[in-house]
Amino acid sequence: DELLPNLQYGFDYKMIEKNFRPILDDMIGEHNVTGCFLQRSIVPLNIHSDWENNPNEDTPGYAVLFPLQLDGDAHTIVFKETSHDKHPNDSNKITNYKFSNEDLKLLGHVPEFRLQRVSEPKKIKWVLGDAIVWKRAHFHCSDNFLTGDTKYKDSLVLFTTK
C-alpha cells in the first residue's frame, strides 16, 4: 500500500461539522462530507486521484485539505488531468509536458511513467490556517518534501460528494 508508513485516522465528520460546515459552504457550496480523517505524512505521496475513495453512489466532489502542523516547507501539487482511476496508467495519454527544473525537484519521488501522463502542475504551498481544495478526479500528489528540512506534515482531509 502506498500510504504506509504514513498514518491516517478516520473519524465521524459530525464531530466537527458545526465548526466546519460554514467554512466549506463558503468555499465549495452545497456538499456532503463522506470522508474525514487526520493524516500524518512522513513519506511523499505519489500521483493519484481521490475518485475511488467513495463510500456511496454519489458523485465525488472536492477534496479539502487543512494543513495543521509541519516542520518545514511542503506543497500539494494538482495536475490538469483527471481520471476515475486511482493512478495514471496506460489508458492515460502521454502529455509530452516539459517540466521545469523546479518542478522536477518537487516531483523527484514520482516515477517517470506517471510524470509522462500529467501536465501543468499547480504547486500549492502549505500555509497553516489555509485550505487547499481540488476536485477529487484531478491527479495530485505531495511534493518531495524530504529533500528539504521537512520530516513530517499533519493535515485534516475531507472528501465531499455532490
Task: Report residues per predicted region.
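Catalytic core of non-heme Fe(II) oxygenases with the double-stranded beta-helix
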Residues: 42-138, 143-162
